[in-house]
Amino acid sequence: MFAQLDTKTVYSFMDSLIDLNHYFERAKQFGYHTIGIMDKDNLYGAYHFIKGCQKNGLQPVLGLEIEILYQERQVLLNLIAQNTQGYHQLLKISTAKMSGKLHMDYFCQHLEGIAVIIPSKGWSDTLVVPFDYYMGVDQYTDLSHMDSKRQLIPLRTVRYFAQDDMETLHMLHAIRDNLSLAETPVVESDQELADCQQLTAFYQTHCPQALQNLEDLVSGIYYDFDTNLKLPHFNRDKSAKQELQDLTEAGLKEKGLWKEPYQSRLLHELVIISDMGFDDYFLIVWDLLRFGRSKGYYMGMGRGSAAGSLVAYALNITGIDPVQHDLLFERFLNKERYSMPDIDIDLPDIYRSEFLRYVRNRYGSDHSAQIVTFSTFGQAIRDVFKRFGVPEYELTNLTKKIGFKDSLATVYEKSISFRQVINSRTEFQKAFAIAKRIEGNPRQTSIHAAGIVMSDDALTNHIPLKSGDDMMITQYDAHAVEANGLLKMDFLGLRNLTFVQKMQEKVAKDYGCQIDITAIDLEDPQTLALFAKGDTKGIFQFEQNGAINLLKRIKPQRFEEIVATTSLNRPGASDYTTNFIKRREGQEKIDLIDPVIAPILEPTYGIMLYQEQVMQIAQVYAGFTLGKADLLRRAMSKKNLQEMQKMEEDFIASAKHLGRAEETARGLFKRMEKFAGYGFNRSHAFAYSALAFQLAYFKAHYPAVFYDIMMNYSSSDYITDALESDFQVAQVTINSIPYTDKIEASKIYMGLKNIKGLPRDFAYWIIEQRPFNSVEDFLTRTPEKYQKKVFLEPLIKIGLFDCFEPNRKKILDNLDGLLVFVNELGSLFSDSSFSWVDTKDYSVTEKYSLEQEIVGVGMSKHPLIDIAEKSTQTFTPISQLVKESEAVVLIQIDSIRIIRTKTSGQQMAFLSVNDTKKKLDVTLFPQEYAIYKDQLKEGEFYYLKGRIKERDHRLQMVCQQVQMAISQKYWLLVENHQFDSQISEILGAFPGTTPVVIHYQKNKETIALTKIQVHVTENLKEKLRPFVLKTVFR
């Protein structure tokens, strides 16, 4: 029977449409018993192909297509692994090929268990190679020209499932080669997956011996994977068990903890670790963290269930004492649940590449590798539509309608406007069909963000590799790597560890004190107060609005309640926040069910927040071992009904044996079952809450250091938060501006790095060359390559030359002339001076807006402050608003979102506003929005009057009145009240947004008109002339 060998899969990137799952399905439909894959150079899909075939009752044949240089010509070869030995040879051959190291001598040394096929299209009678091979033939091969001494074998290339896939493959080739469809060569026909019986009949008729050769070749093919654990040995000269014991005992003694119950707990853990064969694993993790600390890196407090291990604490793998804080080792590791211990290594993100180099050098480049991932066609629609000639602006408009997680089919179903665009043109419908066909297919390789694989022997004995920058990269994904018994470790580059380290260094530099951040008091009052206020912008795990609002509700009074907040800030658990608060305040009864489990539930007021509580209850109440309790916890969290039913009966029987009432036991089990579904890992919550507390400690005690580091090392915006904490943005000059942001004496000095598009080299040049004496001096000394308006204008607009010429508009308007002057005249006539042309400067508001546009924040005095200082109207700062009160706020509008109500279809608006210190959400219902909509504009300043409400634990305003707030007013000087009615009538005829103030000279009375605002024009001035002494607009 025919077997399909030469199938290119989607892992031959953009050269096939054969994905493995559909391949298995179609192969069975077409009557195949044996199928193969033969991707070019790589084995990316090999493991999943073999396992998928076995699962689907198909015989897998693993192949590989390569080209190899021999006698100055490239020879095309198709290789077949005939057995497990051949499989391992393919691993090595593919690795050599994907590393650019494959040559004929190496190839010939790895041919045991390999069948070599040379396709007829690549053969010539002059070809002589140093190995035996089959001749591959297809339906179009002219057999009369073949070498009669060679064994023939059917070899038909497949790249797609059906003929109508050809157009899609043509599109993939166009995308791959970055060509238009017209420029892309047409796809070869007759490369679809054909019916097995038809091909069998063809070869039986035309080339029966080739078919027999094929059957003989594949008949005995079978592959066996070695899935046994292959942990590296840490030290071959010493027992890992003894070394681990020595190190952990020394670690506890150094911490002053060589006493009970630590000694017995340590022995208990060491026995389990040794019995499970993980001594080397702990030593390797210890070694890696030791390397980081030896370099001065802050390695954090640990993460995950590993924080429950005393061995990990003794080795300084974690920074949490699990005995003191009642954390469970069995949640991490136990003999009743055999699985690899999972200690993820957190490290400062800026040093991850150094760790990779250390692993490579310490454990060997053949024994360690990064793990591959595959980038897929997520934005397939952009790639495809582009090849159909759709303009970029249309593409952008179309892709905006696609959500991050939406499939094309989903967005087509959900979005009417998207559907209308697709159906508007025939070519759009065609392109959309193609985009759906390739969506989700792998496009290229990438690297796992954290994963590293390590092995005791050469990795290529187990998996294929490819070359990488810092170290080799696996061809198998993480699942296949672990399935082959290899140790996968996650090296997680955490930006927050970088923050802590840089803050420690800056405190030492600026304040002359060394802070051991791991030894700070986790009950520090100032830091707890910061959490209680929800002042946690920039604090790991607590900077999102949900967490901030939760903190404001809970108002943690001790560190344990911060840990609880982490756990409550999750779906399901958050439903118990009100109960938690009321019980803590004594406003709700705490049901502890049974005195024997009261100590377990009391810290969380009777609420099972943590997975460990479920385990401890099973241990104390029903006599389960902690290992068995962990199996119960897992069954509950995974909702394994069959296992839970069995466990429930076991729980009841064990509880009854200990004298518990059956009804109470059943009720307790149901309660445990309910909470286990969303209970959080307490060890992980504790470790990460400790890291959060460390960051918050700096924010509470060294705010200038905190904001300095956050602004320079984070991509997020912390300026607003700093301003809310009473920091101010300082005005800088060309002679004082730093490169990075700097904070001194509560002043924020924005750096040159914030100026979008400014070359780094130019910024460095400015710092190195200053001081400058004038605008002309700066331009004269500026290198010609930087004498471009695109580089110079931002410097002018943010006021860096105000120290020489405060009129920024004047410098900008004269810039062309200045550049001519310094280049042509300045060098010839050093005593000459530039003739400036005068012009009106930008307004305060315009200057501020330009600064915001260029560096993201205003550096001048905020226009609102100027308005507030001159305001004759009473208003309340946003920070002092009280719920259920009427208030007026003076604000700037950041954004306006308009919607239609579901009931009436009328428009209403949601505003996001700020008063330079705080932000506020404002709602205008249809009636108010209809009145004021023409006045509202983003970036403008207003007095808003309304009712203060609380929603989702945040204050917001329901707006009733809107009034423009501008610092300029229209002043009228009049003799007395004689012409009040005439003046009022004239002012009413010129409605606008400028407030009017009248000063009566006779009695020295000044009145700000509250009901009249005007549009100032020359016509208004002329109309008022007979009735006033003077008008001033300022």
UniProtKB/Swiss-Prot annotation:
Localization per record: Cytoplasm
Subunit structure, as described in the record: DNA polymerase III contains a core (composed of alpha, epsilon and theta chains) that associates with a tau subunit. This core dimerizes to form the PolIII' complex. PolIII' associates with the gamma complex (composed of gamma, delta, delta', psi and chi chains) and with the beta chain to form the complete DNA polymerase III complex.
Organism field: Streptococcus pyogenes
Cited function: DNA polymerase III is a complex, multichain enzyme responsible for most of the replicative synthesis in bacteria. This DNA polymerase also exhibits 3' to 5' exonuclease activity. The alpha chain is the DNA polymerase.
PANTHER family: DNA POLYMERASE III SUBUNIT ALPHA
Catalytic function, reaction form: DNA(n) + a 2'-deoxyribonucleoside 5'-triphosphate = DNA(n+1) + diphosphate
Matching SMART domains: POLIIIAc
Protein name: DNA polymerase III subunit alpha
One record GO biological process: DNA replication
EC numbers on record: 2.7.7.7
EC supergroup of this enzyme: transferase
Organism lineage string: Bacteria, Bacillati, Bacillota, Bacilli, Lactobacillales
UniProt keyword terms in alphabetical order: Cytoplasm, DNA replication, DNA-directed DNA polymerase, Nucleotidyltransferase, Transferase
GO CC term (a single one): cytoplasm
